[in-house]
Amino acid sequence: MPLNLNCYLLNLKIDGVMKKYPEDFIVEEITPEGIVLEAGKDIGFKEENKHDWNGSFIHFTMEKINWNTMDAIRELARRTKTKRKNFGFAGTKDKFALTTQRVGCFGIKPEKLEEIKNSIKDITIRDIQKTNIKLRMGHLWGNKFTIKIRLNETDKYYNDISKYEEILKNKNLDYILNYYGTQRFGTFRPITHIVGKFIYNRDFESAFYTYCGAPINETGVVKEAREMVDNGEFEKALKLFPKKSYYNEIKMIRHYIKTGNYKECFKVLPPQLSSMFVNAYQSYLFNEMINIRHRDYSFDILDGDVVEEGAPTGNILGSDTILSDGIQGDIEKYIIEKENLDLKKFKIEDYGNFPGTRRKLITKIYDFESSIDKDNNIISISFKMERGNYATVVLREIISEI
C-alpha cells in the first residue's frame, strides 16, 4: 500500500545525504506567539518570576537529540515518578535529529524538573513556567527547520557545488504540495495507514498483526520477534522485543495474552497513538487527492473550490465530511468509490470518532534560505512551515534520497 507521494513541483534531485549526524537536522518549534525555541538558548523568562506564577500546569522546553518524543516523555515520567499521561505536548518531533519543543505537565513540582533538567543523556529541560493553560496537541504555530545536505561524489556538481547556489536562488520555493509526509505513515516501517485502514474496516485482528508482527526493513531480534507474533508464539516474542524501544508492542501482546481480544489491545496504547492509525489512513486518502488534482487539473482556484488563505482546499474524509462542489468534489467522490468508503464508518464505536476537516492542497514555505560550504561540499537550507506540514515534503523536491 503506497504512501501516495507521487508528484513533484521542482524535483531538483540533488545526490546527497541528510542526517549523517542528528545535528544535521534541526527542528525548532515555533510557539503560537511566533517565538522560535532556539536550540541551546533560553526564551528569556525573567528569573525572578519563573516559579512565582499561579497555575495548575507547568510548561517547559525540552531539547533532545536522537530521542523520539514519546520515549522522551516516558523517560521524564519515570524520572519524576509520575504517570506518562500527566504530560502533554503540542506536536511530535523527529527522532534522529536535534529538536526543541514545549512540553506541559501537572502533578510535578518545578523543583523536581530543576533537579533532573540536565540528568538525562541527550535531553535538556529549560524555561520552566507555571501556567493556567493545558498544553494540547496543535498548540504551536509551526517549526523552523535547519538542514545540512552532504553531497555524494556521484552528484553532477560535486566538483562545482557553487552551481547549486544559483539554482536554489532561482527556484520558486514559496509554495509546495501539501502532502502528508513519510513520518505520518512511519519513516522506517510505513504501516501506520495500513493499520488505520484495517481499524476503519473493524478488522482489529489484521490491525494487531500488522502493527506487532509483519517485519519490514528489520533485522536481528526485532525481525525474529515480529515473526514469532505472526506465528502466534507470543511469549517468545515478548522475550525478544527490546523493552525500551518496543514498549507499545509489548503492552499490546501482553494484553492479548490476557484477554484474547484484538480490539481491546489498542486501548492500552497512548490516545495519540491509537488515533494516529486512522488519521494516517485519512492522510493517505488526502495525498491521493493531491495526486489527481496535480495530474489532471491545476491548483488554480476552480469553480466549487473552498479557499483558505488563497489556496484551494480538499477534504480530509471523515464522519462529518461535507463534500466539495465542482471538480474537487468529483475527485473526492472518485476516491470514496475507489476505496469503497462509507464516511459514517469513520465514527468507530468504542474506539474514536474521526470527523475529518479541510486542508490546503498547496501550502506556503516561509523564510527559505540556503548556503553553500564549498570546502566540505555541504548545502545548508532553512525554512519555516506551519503546524501540520512536513519538512520531508520540501526535501523530496530537493534531494534524491527522499
Curated annotation (Swiss-Prot):
Molecular-function annotations in GO: RNA binding; tRNA pseudouridine(13) synthase activity
Gene Ontology BP terms: tRNA pseudouridine synthesis
Keyword tRNA processing (UniProt): yes
E.C. number: 5.4.99.27
Catalytic activity: uridine(13) in tRNA = pseudouridine(13) in tRNA
Keywords carried by this UniProt record: Isomerase, tRNA processing
Catalytic residues, chain numbering: 94 (nucleophile)
Domain TRUD: 175-364
One Pfam family this sequence matches: TruD
Domain of life: Archaea
Record has tRNA processing as a keyword: yes
Functional summary from the UniProt entry: Could be responsible for synthesis of pseudouridine from uracil-13 in transfer RNAs.
Family: Belongs to the pseudouridine synthase TruD family.
HAMAP family documented for this protein: TruD
The protein's name in its UniProt record: Probable tRNA pseudouridine synthase D
Organism: Methanococcus aeolicus (strain ATCC BAA-1280 / DSM 17508 / OCM 812 / Nankai-3)
Biological classification of the source: Archaea, Methanobacteriati, Methanobacteriota, Methanomada group, Methanococci
